[in-house]
Every structure is written in structure tokens, then in C-alpha cells.
From Swiss-Prot:
Enzyme Commission numbers on file: 1.8.1.8
Similarity comment: Belongs to the thioredoxin family. DsbD subfamily.
GO MF term list: electron transfer activity; protein-disulfide reductase [NAD(P)H] activity
Protein name per its UniProtKB record: Thiol:disulfide interchange protein DsbD
Disulfide bond residue pairs: C135-C141, C212-C334, C522-C525
Taxonomic lineage from the root: Bacteria, Pseudomonadati, Pseudomonadota, Gammaproteobacteria, Alteromonadales
Membrane topology classification: Multi-pass membrane protein
GO CC terms of this entry: plasma membrane
UniProt feature, compositional bias: Polar residues: 161-173
Alphabetical GO biological process terms: cell redox homeostasis; cytochrome complex assembly
Protein localization: Cell inner membrane
Signal peptide: 1-22
Thioredoxin domain span: 469-608
């Protein structure tokens, strides 16, 4: 059992300490793909995108939609509900096929849509509610919209046409299947609160297996393991439970506040000063795992919290709860698809109570594996012994990975890579010594124990990854040289007036303009610089464009606040494009990370 456990920890360390592995798994949970932070001014309002009209003559209700270019309605999202009337099944046109990234081929309507509803038994105060939902090709999905049509009794020759937009009531019902975040957003709009909470709990459970939650595992396990030999299953469960509650409280409050405050709140808690402070905190926590000092509340505090914490050794319920709050706030800052869905709903409807409940359920789902892992500290782990010091040291190394994870958002890439290489090599060296000592203690001849060999393989892989990172630092590839050279092509702009002046200068030279709004705390901004802007096709597509860049790290500075207000910037990264007349092409604005091929195609479609 001990050998198997040691192998699991070694493999866990080998994976979590590999930044490349974490990068590959961001996929749809990445904040950069979130529609929450897209600029609403890029898109038409729902009634402009899908102009609604109807005409009633006797028992026939003719309904039509004038769909704007680059917008579409989902066929399967149409729903009909009658009040004081009956109607036969509505026969909609077939529509055209549309490839949906997450839900396969869907039928959609573009340009114009018309259909007829056959009414029966229309009584007084009769009405029919038509619910529909559509999206913009640029990446925004509207919430389901409903129009309530007041019907007239069958009077030969009498007809009723569409009322003004004020008369048509809009609600938020139906289902969205454009993307995961919008699907989850609109689940909140269903009648069943229980089903909504279950859906978000499952979403959180799936989310718990992504790199976004990675920092929480070493933090919680470090707290549990740090309790020492006196740890029991009950105490481990209690500590884990309150840690998860702290995390859940954070996500619930964070989601509501972010929905109200937008990217300014995000900027504060991703500020370098905050990240440095938290990195120092986790370094101290790691040192405690190595036995440099013991973490314990002052005696006076312990006495005051005696009734609450049952004199828990090495900490308290309050302390663990606060650690969960901190972990949820900063150590796992990814705005994921489930979280984005809840935020999107809150921002659109203002239903904070329902949104907060869903976020809490999402957090509990995220915390379930954490709860199981933490509770295992008193049940599944072997009994006290020398192995405990090894495990504490392992989690000390994992805790040291958290500061690197936080700092790499604003430190130079070469420094981040050096920290990862150093940490992996030091960890591999430690594991090698521990493996040798374990083999000697078990009287296992070198090269002959199965578990010894398997542990050695894991150590070898760690050494390989660490050495590979170190090699890239010492002998950078030509691509890195290209990256550094390409960054110099940006001209820095600091104010709205300077931006307008630079656009005029570019237009006088017959050039268009691309403006990159970035911040040091913005991961997706760094991805743009590393993967997209250096691409040859992207550079060719923008060869006749002046590249401007605005540092939005201090989001609330006077100059940046003016830019934010003028261009209605809700989140980063945002890429603005200006034509030869100096006009911003608002519908072509890019918000969120785009891969090089996609971005190149986007630029080519703009500047043909």
C-alpha cells in the first residue's frame, strides 16, 4: 500500500509540475473564450438581429422574422405555448445545417423565416407565447426571447398585426446549445430550480478535473497532512469541508460581484502586487511543510476558538475556511464555461439570488473531489510512520509550484520557464534521494524492485522535462528570437488622444490600424503575443496595418478609464481594428484569445 501510494504522489507531482501539460488542458474552460467579456456594442440588440412580426386573420396566425446578416436562429429552440386557445403542431421550414462545436450539426434559419400557426378555440384574453433563440456568427448568443401575442376571436375579415416592441413581452425561457457557457446560462432560466442546481453541481464536478483547480489540491492536502499523527478521519473531513465551504463562498460572491463590476474587479485580484503577496504566503506554507517552522494560531486565539475548533492541532476551522476563501479567489482564477454561464445569466437578468445559488452548487461540485481527497488523510492513507515526512515534503514542493503558477502571469517568459525548470529538477532530485533511501530501507536491490523501477521511471520523466526546459533557456530556438523581435513592431500608446493621432497618421500613409489592449495580469494577452502575433500568416495579413498597443494593466488609471469608457471595453484581451477612414470596425473587434489561423482568417476578412 505504501509503495502504491508513493507512486501515485510521484505521478501527481510529475504531472502537476509540468506547465505544458496544464496548458494543453485549458480548452473550453479557458477564460479567453468567454462570451461574458465580449463587447455588446459589436452586436445588434436582439430585436434588431431578429425583427419579429405577425399577422392574424381568423384562425391563421402568420409569423415572420427578418434575420440580420451574420445572425441566425436555432430551429430546435422554437417553443409555442397557448393561453385560452389551442393550436395544431407548428410546421417550421427545414432550415440549413450548421456545425456546432459542442453539439454537432444543428438546423438554423438565416435571412428570412415565415411560418403559420393554425389556431383553434380562441377565447377571451387569449394569447400565444413564441420563444426563440439565436446567435451571431461572431461569437455571441442571445438568451431565449419570448414574444406574447394577444389573439382576437375569429371574426371574418378581421386581422391583427404586430404591436409595437413595448407590447410584445420578453421573457427568458428555453435552452441554448451554441456553446457550453450559454447552455448553462440558459439552464438557469428553466422553471426547475432543483434541476438547475444539479446541472451546475455536475458542471463543477467535471470542472474539478481541469488545471483550473490544480492549485487547490496541494493547498488542501498540505493543510491536512500538516496536522501530523493526530489526524483522524473526522478531523480531516471537518477541515476539508470548511475549506470547500470557503472556496464555495468565494466563488458565489465573486461571481455576483464580477457580473456587476466587470473586468475591473478581475484586474484588482490579478494585480502583480496581490499575486506577489500570495506567492510569498504559499512559500511560507511550503516552508512549514519542510519543517522550517510550525504553523499554529497564537495560544490566546486558540482558547477563544476552542468551542468552534475543538482545539484542532496546527490550525482552526476559521483558518481553514479563510484558506479556502483565498484559494478560490486567487489560486484558481480561471473563468470557466460553467462559471461564465452563471455570470452571463446574472449579467443579463440581474437575478442574483438564483445565480448565486447556481454558483454555490457549482462550487460544491468542484469541491467534492477535494473533500474526498482531504478526508482520505485520516482513512485511506497508511498509518503514521516515516512516510509522513516524505509526503509532507512532496506537498511542500507542490505548494512551491503555486507561486510559479501565479507569478508567470506577469514575469518574463524566460523567468517563468527558469522557475519551472528549477522546481522540476529540484523535485526530481529529492524524489531520487527518497527513492534510494526507500529501496535501502526495504532491502531492495537496485534495478530489481518493480515499484522501485516504476518510481525511477517517473523520476526520469521529471528529469527529462526539467532538463528540456533548461536546455531551451540555454539554447533558445529561432522561434523565440522571432518572438522577441516581433514584439518590437508594436508602438506603445498611452491615451485616447494619442491613439486618435496615431490612427490619423496611419491613414495618411494609406495604412489601417490594429490596436492590442493588453495587461500584465491577462493570460490570454500573453497567449496572443506568444502564439498569434508571431505567426507568419498573421504578420502578412497585417502587413499594411500599423500595430499599436495599449497597456491596460492599471485598468482604473485616468487615461485607461477614458479609453474604457470611449470604446466600452469590458474585458481583455481586446483587439480593435480601424479602417482607412479612421473608423473603428466595431463588429470586427476581437475579444478573447484566437489561434493564429483563426485570427489570420479574421484579419483577412476585414482588410481584403
Amino acid at each position: 500500500m505504501k509503495n502504491l501510494l508513493s507512486l501515485c504522489f510521484l505521478m501527481l507531482a510529475a504531472f502537476t509540475l509540468n506547465p505544458a501539460a496544464a496548458q494543453e488542458k485549458q480548452s473550453i474552460f479557458d477564460v479567453s473564450n468567454s462570451s461574458l467579456f465580449s463587447n455588446d456594442d459589436e452586436f445588434l440588440k436582439v430585436d434588431q438581429a431578429f425583427a419579429f412580426n405577425f399577422y392574424q386573420k381568423n384562425n391563421l396566425l402568420e409569423v415572420s422574422f427578418d434575420i440580420a446578416p451574420e445572425y441566425y436562429l436555432y430551429r430546435h429552440q422554437f417553443k409555442f405555448k397557448g393561453k385560452n386557445t389551442q393550436f395544431t403542431s407548428v410546421l417550421l421550414p427545414d432550415g440549413i445545417d450548421h456545425e456546432d462545436e459542442f453539439f454537432g450539426v444543428q438546423k438554423i434559419f438565416t435571412e428570412n423565416l415565415a411560418f403559420t400557426v393554425n389556431l383553434e378555440n380562441v377565447s377571451n384574453d387569449a394569447s400565444i407565447k413564441i420563444t426563440y433563440q439565436g446567435c451571431a456568427e461572431k461569437g455571441l448568443c442571445y438568451p431565449p426571447t419570448s414574444k406574447v401575442i394577444k389573439l382576437s376571436k375569429f371574426i371574418l375579415g378581421e386581422s391583427t398585426s404586430a404591436p409595437s416592441s413595448d407590447a410584445a413581452q420578453q421573457t427568458n425561457e428555453g435552452e441554448v446549445k451554441k456553446s457550453e457557457q450559454h447552455q448553462l446560462s440558459d439552464m438557469l432560466k428553466q422553471d426547475s430550480l432543483l434541476l438547475t442546481l444539479i446541472a451546475f453541481f455536475v458542471g463543477g464536478l467535471l470542472l474539478s478535473f481541469t488545471p483550473c483547480v490544480f492549485p487547490m489540491y496541494p493547498i488542501l492536502t498540505g493543510i491536512i497532512v500538516g496536522q501530523g499523527e493526530g489526524l483522524t478521519t473526522k478531523k480531516a473531513f471537518t477541515l476539508s469541508f470548511f475549506y470547500v465551504q470557503g472556496m464555495a463562498i468565494t466563488y458565489t460572491l465573486l461571481g455576483v460581484v464580477v457580473a456587476m463590476a466587470g473586468a475591473k474587479f478581475q484586474a484588482v485580484f490579478q494585480h502583480p502586487i496581490v499575486l506577489i503577496g500570495l506567492s510569498i504566503l504559499f512559500i511560507f506554507l511550503a516552508l512549514s511543510m519542510f519543517g522550517v517552522f510550525n504553523l499554529a494560531l497564537p495560544a490566546s486565539w486558540q482558547n477563544k476558538l476552542n468551542n468552534v475548533s475543538n482545539k484542532q492541532k496546527g490550525g482552526s476551522i476559521t483558518g481553514v475556511l479563510m484558506m479556502g476563501v483565498i484559494s478560490g479567489l486567487v489560486a484558481s482564477p480561471c473563468t470557466t464555461a460553467p462559471l461564465t454561464g452563471a455570470l452571463l445569466y446574472i449579467s443579463q437578468t440581474g437575478d442574483v439570488v438564483l445565480g448565486a445559488s447556481a454558483l454555490y452548487a457549482l462550487s460544491l461540485g468542484m469541491g467534492l473531489p477535494l473533500l474526498i481527497l482531504g478526508s482520505s488523510g485520516g482513512k485511506l492513507l497508511p498509518k503514521a510512520g516515516a512516510w509522513m515526512n516524505i509526503i509532507k515534503n512532496i506537498f511542500g514542493l507542490l505548494l512551491l509550484a503555486v507561486p510559479v503558477f501565479l507569478l508567470e502571469r506577469f514575469i518574463p517568459e524566460v523567468a517563468s520557464q527558469a522557475l519551472w525548470a528549477l522546481l522540476i529538477l529540484v523535485s526530481a532530485s529529492y524524489f531520487y534521494v527518497a527513492n534510494q533511501n526507500h529501496a535501502a530501507a526495504q532491502n531492495v536491490q537496485q534495478g530489481k524492485g518493480f515499484w522501485y523501477g516504476l518510481r525511477s521511471l517517473v523520476i526520469f520523466l521529471m528529469l527529462f522535462f526539467g532538463a528540456n526546459l533548461a536546455y531551451q533557456l540555454i539554447y533558445p530556438s529561432s522561434n523565440n528570437v522571432t518572438n522577441n523581435a516581433q514584439h518590437a513592431s508594436f508602438k506603445q500608446v498611452t491615451s485616447l488622444a494619442q491613439l486618435e493621432d496615431e490612427v490619423k497618421k496611419a491613414n495618411m500613409q494609406g495604412k489601417t490600424v490594429m490596436v492590442d489592449l493588453y495587461a500584465d495580469w491577462c493570460i490570454a494577452c500573453k497567449e496572443f503575443e506568444k502564439y498569434t502575433f508571431v505567426d507568419a500568416d498573421v504578420q502578412k495579413a497585417l502587413s499594411n496595418s500599423v500595430w499599436l498597443q495599449i497597456d491596460m494593466t492599471e485598468f482604473d488609471s485616468t487615461d485607461n478609464a477614458e479609453l474604457v469608457q470611449h470604446y466600452t471595453i469590458l474585458g481583455l484581451p481586446s483587439i480593435l481594428f480601424f479602417d482607412l477612414q479612421g473608423n473603428e470596425l466595431t463588429k470586427q473587434r476581437t475579444t478573447g484569445f484566437m489561434k493564429a489561423a483563426e485570427f489570420s482568417a479574421h484579419v483577412k476578412s476585414i482588410f481584403k
